[in-house]
């Protein structure tokens, strides 16, 4: 495959583009559209991207040669037509999906007696394969079913047998119909799930009920209720699951839902794809605009209001955000592909978008306030992307590679392209190249699978060398252990040989913590230089871990490294513990000096230091399924060091075990207090500096 050699070049282009384009999303080509075009990289940062969709035309009543729309609240595509629910006009306008020309206006709906039926204010529409119309008549609290000639076939009212609470209205807002003509209705006042009806209008069951999300407020209220009387609990608001705000159905009969959480920060499971059993089978990702602050590990999410969701023939998701007037596109792997649209009323933007449908490769958005349907068509770049998706299921790997390479030539920031190219390499058995592509895409799970195959092939090719290396390593460990054991053993009639040299003393405490720290105090083995050396090893280990932990377990970048935080994790923590313990134990008649406390605690950190280096090295040879080994190494290092700290405090201060535990608990409390005081002092110092700076600046300005 000749073109496979281009991947290294494309990777270099991508890395260069990240350096040049990791800027505010306002850095766009102003000729592309009236809104910002961007996508997110593997680190959650917005980067410039060519426009995937641009506004093509607006469908209005005037353009179709009919009276103007009045609040088009919903649209649906069926049978080669697009049906627009013109809510306040009480009519349905059908246009041809091929050229968006007028097909027919349905404005006279009658019952069996010939009386006209009015459904003005309706919020939802569905059309079956046999041409029947299903109307969510919201104001009249009913579902109307008409045949293709607009004659009433069925009226569905509130199912009293399951909704026996007379206070709960049947305010049906959205509706979909599957291939068996089963009806799924959404009511904003009913949080038990989607109501499923048979083709004859009989209530069947609730479908896809949401659960109450466990939050700190839920836990707090639950604990508080235990102390309240029955009457008091009855007066308190009950936690109820969040309802849906919209739903749609794809060609395979899967129902997509949108949670009713207007203008709330995005979260996982806001968009769901419900299986036939009502379970969410969609990958849980965070939808919407976001920028990630890696230094504080806090995900800043812009406020948004999702109102509709649609899919195309390739499994891509299109999500409409009425709060920001944007459409977000995600591929079937959950990767953010593009965003387009906006709020301001210009071409390609909206004032009150209400519904979304995908017609072939076009995206149609109804704007209730502007009384129009805005059509977006893919650009040249967008056509390349959709064309690449169209061949994704092909067995022709060369064709798939070429398609996604063409996408990268137009946009080297497209992580979906790297993901798909990685998939091609993986299917070819080129696991090293697949790992490189998955790494750029930030696809850790796929990287792990490719690495597992690569590791297996490597071991098969180099088994003899690996076995020889393991034998040599075991021999080196054995002789090293024998040497250390000899140096740390007790010889008859002599002292501990290791204690004759304080530089090797910490090794003895690893195996003999109590005896070791007893000798530490009696023989004055403390050394500031050695203690600082161990802490320095911890500091270097943290840096080593940050940069060299395997990609499967770590996607840190060099620019995310925070030196002050790293210093606080190593030097700062141990110094703070030593100061707090010395302060507490001075009041509790402890025998240890500050030097003894500081050095003994530093010595006790040696197992954890070893675990940091071992964990980092091992992370480059393990897969995601083997992460338990890293957890075990980390836990052993922490517990071993914690045990040594207890032994150190026990021996240095000459405490009983109970006194030692109490002293450590008080030390932790003192650390919290000291930390609070440091933060308070820093805050006050900052405010004083700001005040002094403003005063001096004012004086300088007045003196001119």
PLM regions: where:
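Hydrophobic core
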Residues: 15-23
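Eukaryotic scaffold repeat domains enriched in small/polar residues
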Residues: 28-425, 559
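Hydrophobic alpha-helical transmembrane segments and adjacent short intramembrane/lumenal linkers
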Residues: 564-568, 577-679, 684
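Juxtamembrane boundary at the C-terminal end of a transmembrane helix
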Residues: 677-704
């Amino acid at each position: 495959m000749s073109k496979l050699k281009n991947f290294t070049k494309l990777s270099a282009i991508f890395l260069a583009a990240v350096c040049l384009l990791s800027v505010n999303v306002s850095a766009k080509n102003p000729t592309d559209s009236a809104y910002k075009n961007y996508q997110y990289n593997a680190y959650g940062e917005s980067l410039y991207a060519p426009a995937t969709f641009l506004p093509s035309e607006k469908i209005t009543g005037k353009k179709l040669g009919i009276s103007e729309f009045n609040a088009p609240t919903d649209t649906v595509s069926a049978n080669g037509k697009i049906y627009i629910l013109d809510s306040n006009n009480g009519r349905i306008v059908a246009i041809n999906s091929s050229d968006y020309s007028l097909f027919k206006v349905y404005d006279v709906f009658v019952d069996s007696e010939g009386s006209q039926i009015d459904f003005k204010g309706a919020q939802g529409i569905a059309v079956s394969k046999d041409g029947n119309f299903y109307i969510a008549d919201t104001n009249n609290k009913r579902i109307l079913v008409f045949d293709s000639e607009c004659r009433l076939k069925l009226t569905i009212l509130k199912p009293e047998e399951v909704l026996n609470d007379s206070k709960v209205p049947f305010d049906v807002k959205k509706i979909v119909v599957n291939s068996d003509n089963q009806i799924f209705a959404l009511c904003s006042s009913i949080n038990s799930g989607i109501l499923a009806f048979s083709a004859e209008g009989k209530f069947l069951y609730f479908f896809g009920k949401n659960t109450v999300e466990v939050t700190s407020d839920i836990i707090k209220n639950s604990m508080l209720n235990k102390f309240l009387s029955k009457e008091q609990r009855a007066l308190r608001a009950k936690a109820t699951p969040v309802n849906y705000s919209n739903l749609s159905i794809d060609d395979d009969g899967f129902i997509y839902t949108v949670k009713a959480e207007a203008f709330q920060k995005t979260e996982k499971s806001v968009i769901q794809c419900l299986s036939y059993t009502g379970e969410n089978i969609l990958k849980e990702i965070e939808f919407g605009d976001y920028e990630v602050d890696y230094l504080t590990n806090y995900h800043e999410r812009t406020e948004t209001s999702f109102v509709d969701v649609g899919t195309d023939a390739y499994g891509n998701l299109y999500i409409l955000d009425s709060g920001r007037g944007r459409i977000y596109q995600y591929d079937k792997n959950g990767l953010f592909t593009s965003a387009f649209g906006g709020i301001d009323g210009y071409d390609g933007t909206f004032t009150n978008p209400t519904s979304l449908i995908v017609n072939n490769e076009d995206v149609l958005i109804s704007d209730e306030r502007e009384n129009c349907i805005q059509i977006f068509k893919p650009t040249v770049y967008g056509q390349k992307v959709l064309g690449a998706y169209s061949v994704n299921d092909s067995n022709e790997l060369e064709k798939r590679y070429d398609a996604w390479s063409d996408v990268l030539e137009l946009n080297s920031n497209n992580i979906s392209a790297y993901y798909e190219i990685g998939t091609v390499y993986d299917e070819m058995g080129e696991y090293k190249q697949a790992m490189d592509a998955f790494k750029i895409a930030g696809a850790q799970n796929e990287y792990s699978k490719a690495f597992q195959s690569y590791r297996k092939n490597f071991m098969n090719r180099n088994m003899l060398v690996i076995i020889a290396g393991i034998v040599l390593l075991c021999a080196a460990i054995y002789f090293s252990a024998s040497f250390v054991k000899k140096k740390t053993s007790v010889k008859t009639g002599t002292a501990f040989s290791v204690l004759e040299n304080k530089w090797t003393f910490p090794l003895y405490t690893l195996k003999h913590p109590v005896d070791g720290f007893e000798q530490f105090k009696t023989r004055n083995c403390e050394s500031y230089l050695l203690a600082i050396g161990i802490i320095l090893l911890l500091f270097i280990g943290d840096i080593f871990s940050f940069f060299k932990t395997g990609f499967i377990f770590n996607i840190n970048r060099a620019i995310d490294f925070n030196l002050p935080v790293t210093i606080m994790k190593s030097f700062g923590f141990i110094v703070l513990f030593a100061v707090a313990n010395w302060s507490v134990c001075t009041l509790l008649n402890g025998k240890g000096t500050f030097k003894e406390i500081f050095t003994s605690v530093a010595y006790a950190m040696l197992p954890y230091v070893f675990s940091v280096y071992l964990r980092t090295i091992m992370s480059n040879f393990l897969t995601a399924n083997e992460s338990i080994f890293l957890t075990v190494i980390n836990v052993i290092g922490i517990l071993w060091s914690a045990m040594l700290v207890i032994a150190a405090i026990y021996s240095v201060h000459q405490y009983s075990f109970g006194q030692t535990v109490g002293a450590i608990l008080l030390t932790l409390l003192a650390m919290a207090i000291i930390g609070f005081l440091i933060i308070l002092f820093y805050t006050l110092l900052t405010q004083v500096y700001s005040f002094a700076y403003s005063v001096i600046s004012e004086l300088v300005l007045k003196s001119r």
